[in-house]
């Protein structure tokens, strides 16, 4: 079976092609906003529209397949930025109609999890999903990915990206922020907000900005915001691990590239004799392959959607998505 997947939830448009065993192509282009600015949804959509056909051709050439060879077309139905989502959905619908292929809707967050499981070999993990749009601890139970902790406001990736922009660091901001953090010597007091199993990062960002404006050494503020954010993630993950008794932890999403987060989570895993899996860097950020792979799992389980019903979903919780491809032997 061969599936083409299109990702376009935010700043990246990606086209991936997979078969039953491997990724055949993973071609992506990222919209880079002006220095110091965040993503403007319509500018991102314009970027995606310009790149879409070129990316489809690149992916087909890389995979050495034709559109007529596809068994189905998958697309990121949500959640995400409306204008950006519509570009990917439109391209997917066009291919589905022109070539008579089934259309498969994919939840962006589920796709991050499934590509991480596929590339690491994890079977039944507790997942720390951390990116610019997601911050949650989740695991499969009863036919869905259930949430065992999440942000109450902004994502950890958004928090750190905004602070990096405030400092004038180049895009992508988090790696440069962590480089600055490594030069820090003193941990400063910042809001550490964990309520039950939920976290808050908005106040952390605001307090860090205030410290910089007060003249505190920037490197120390970087060290403090990064470590405080990641320690919060570690606490919530550890509690969920103790509750569920999982023996695997997966870090998925763009922030999974962080070596600092990985080192902290290695400590958590070792304390519970769990195996830590981290999604490979090329599949950590938004990418087409994760949509294609999750689309393949879904389509083989009988999931497809009509053109009329393929409206994008800007807001779509991960625990609203049925997961029919995981067998009942996984609790």
Swiss-Prot record:
<dbReference type="GO" id="GO:0005506">
    <property type="term" value="F:iron ion binding"/>
</dbReference>
<keyword id="KW-0819">tRNA processing</keyword>
<feature type="binding site">
    <location>
        <position position="178"/>
    </location>
    <ligand>
        <name>substrate</name>
    </ligand>
</feature>
<keyword id="KW-0963">Cytoplasm</keyword>
<keyword id="KW-0808">Transferase</keyword>
<feature type="binding site">
    <location>
        <position position="286"/>
    </location>
    <ligand>
        <name>Fe cation</name>
    </ligand>
</feature>
<dbReference type="GO" id="GO:0002949">
    <property type="term" value="P:tRNA threonylcarbamoyladenosine modification"/>
</dbReference>
<comment type="similarity">
    <text>Belongs to the KAE1 / TsaD family.</text>
</comment>
<keyword id="KW-0408">Iron</keyword>
<feature type="binding site">
    <location>
        <position position="161"/>
    </location>
    <ligand>
        <name>substrate</name>
    </ligand>
</feature>
<feature type="binding site">
    <location>
        <position position="258"/>
    </location>
    <ligand>
        <name>substrate</name>
    </ligand>
</feature>
<dbReference type="InterPro" id="IPR043129">
    <property type="entry name" value="ATPase_NBD"/>
</dbReference>
<dbReference type="Pfam" id="PF00814">
    <property type="entry name" value="TsaD"/>
</dbReference>
<feature type="binding site">
    <location>
        <begin position="129"/>
        <end position="133"/>
    </location>
    <ligand>
        <name>substrate</name>
    </ligand>
</feature>
<dbReference type="GO" id="GO:0005737">
    <property type="term" value="C:cytoplasm"/>
</dbReference>
<dbReference type="InterPro" id="IPR000905">
    <property type="entry name" value="Gcp-like_dom"/>
</dbReference>
<dbReference type="GO" id="GO:0061711">
    <property type="term" value="F:N(6)-L-threonylcarbamoyladenine synthase activity"/>
</dbReference>
<feature type="binding site">
    <location>
        <position position="108"/>
    </location>
    <ligand>
        <name>Fe cation</name>
    </ligand>
</feature>
<dbReference type="InterPro" id="IPR034680">
    <property type="entry name" value="Kae1_archaea_euk"/>
</dbReference>
<comment type="function">
    <text>Required for the formation of a threonylcarbamoyl group on adenosine at position 37 (t(6)A37) in tRNAs that read codons beginning with adenine. Is probably involved in the transfer of the threonylcarbamoyl moiety of threonylcarbamoyl-AMP (TC-AMP) to the N6 group of A37.</text>
</comment>
<dbReference type="InterPro" id="IPR017861">
    <property type="entry name" value="KAE1/TsaD"/>
</dbReference>
<feature type="binding site">
    <location>
        <position position="112"/>
    </location>
    <ligand>
        <name>Fe cation</name>
    </ligand>
</feature>
<keyword id="KW-0479">Metal-binding</keyword>
<keyword id="KW-0012">Acyltransferase</keyword>
<protein>
    <recommendedName>
        <fullName>tRNA N6-adenosine threonylcarbamoyltransferase</fullName>
        <ecNumber>2.3.1.234</ecNumber>
    </recommendedName>
</protein>
<dbReference type="GO" id="GO:0000408">
    <property type="term" value="C:EKC/KEOPS complex"/>
</dbReference>
């Amino acid at each position: 079976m061969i599936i083409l997947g299109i990702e376009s939830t935010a700043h990246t448009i990606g086209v991936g092609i997979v078969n039953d065993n491997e990724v055949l192509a993973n071609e992506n282009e990222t919209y880079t906003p002006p220095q110091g600015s965040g993503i403007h949804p319509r500018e991102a959509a314009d970027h995606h529209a310009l790149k879409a056909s070129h990316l489809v051709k690149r992916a087909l050439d890389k995979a050495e397949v034709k559109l007529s060879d596809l068994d189905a077309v998958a697309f990121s139905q949500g959640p995400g930025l409306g204008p950006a989502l519509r570009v990917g959905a439109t391209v997917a619908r066009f291919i589905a109609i022109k070539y008579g292929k089934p259309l498969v809707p994919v939840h962006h967050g589920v796709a991050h999890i499934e590509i991480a499981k596929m590339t690491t070999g994890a079977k039944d993990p507790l997942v720390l999903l951390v990116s610019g749009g997601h911050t949650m601890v989740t695991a499969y139970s009863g036919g869905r990915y259930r949430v065992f902790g999440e942000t109450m406001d902004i994502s950890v990736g958004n928090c750190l990206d905004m602070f990096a922009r405030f400092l004038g660091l180049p895009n992508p901001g988090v790696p440069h922020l962590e480089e600055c953090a490594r030069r820090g010597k003193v941990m400063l007091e910042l809001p550490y907000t964990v309520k039950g199993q939920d976290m808050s990062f908005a106040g952390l960002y605001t307090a860090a900005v205030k410290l910089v404006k007060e003249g505190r050494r920037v490197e120390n503020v970087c060290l403090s915001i990064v470590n405080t954010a990641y320690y919060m993630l570690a606490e919530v993950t550890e509690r969920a691990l103790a509750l569920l008794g999982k023996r695997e932890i997966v870090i998925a999403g763009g922030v999974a590239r962080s070596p600092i987060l990985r080192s902290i989570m290695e400590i958590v895993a070792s304390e519970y004799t769990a195996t830590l899996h981290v999604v490979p860097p090329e599949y950590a950020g938004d990418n087409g392959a994760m949509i294609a792979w999750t689309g393949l799992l879904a389509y083989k389980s009988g999931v497809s959607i009509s053109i009329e019903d393929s409206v994008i979903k800007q807001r779509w919780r991960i625990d609203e998505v049925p997961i029919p491809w995981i067998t009942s032997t996984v609790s």
